[in-house]
């Protein structure tokens, strides 16, 4: 697993051993960031939240492409260790915040985010629950983009969001949402 583009292009990312963490595949990340680039134009200055962060690959990719700051939300100890190691290895500590809390009950945001990534474990209903909790906690800024990765057999119809596009990549389904 590696950073795809930007200042840290080609830099490897550490991942915890075992099956507890399922990092977004490089191909799916490439597709996702292509979709986002066509809509956003640039990542410069954006504030990003990476929920169910795991290794932090999505938030770190956004930072590599110019995002101003990323907040990572994760509870798994092994994933947190890999995430913190990746942030340190890339020299991103000043542009990153790590919150060891549940992404499906994250509480109130200190500030709203322009771009949010959700990559919950497949098949547990966490995407819909997390989207509702994020909305309630004022995590998305007005007009924010939200990326949600699910398995191909999952669909989303979250209240308070509009689905911009859905794309299947391998075993993953990528949903791009906007705040209504």
Q: Across the structure, where does each feature detected by a protein language model lie?
A:
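Class I S-adenosyl-L-methionine-dependent methyltransferase catalytic core
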Residues: 1-180
């Amino acid at each position: 697993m590696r950073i795809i583009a930007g200042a840290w292009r080609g830099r490897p990312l550490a991942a915890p051993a075992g099956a507890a963490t399922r990092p977004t595949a490089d191909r799916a990340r490439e597709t996702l960031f292509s979709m986002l680039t066509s809509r956003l134009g640039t990542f410069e200055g954006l504030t990003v939240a990476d929920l169910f962060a795991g290794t932090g690959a999505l938030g770190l990719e956004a930072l590599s492409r110019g995002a101003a700051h990323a907040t990572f939300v994760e509870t798994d100890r092994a994933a947190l260790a890999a995430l913190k190691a990746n942030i340190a290895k890339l020299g991103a500590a000043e542009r990153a915040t790590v919150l060891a809390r549940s992404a499906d009950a994250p509480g109130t945001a200190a500030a709203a985010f322009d771009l949010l990534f959700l990559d919950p474990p497949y098949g547990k209903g966490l995407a819909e629950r997390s989207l509702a909790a994020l909305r309630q906690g004022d995590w998305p800024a007005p007009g924010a983009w939200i990326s949600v990765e699910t398995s191909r057999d999952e669909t989303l119809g979250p209240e308070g969001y509009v689905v911009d596009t859905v794309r299947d990549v391998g075993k993953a389904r990528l949903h791009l949402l906007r705040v209504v």
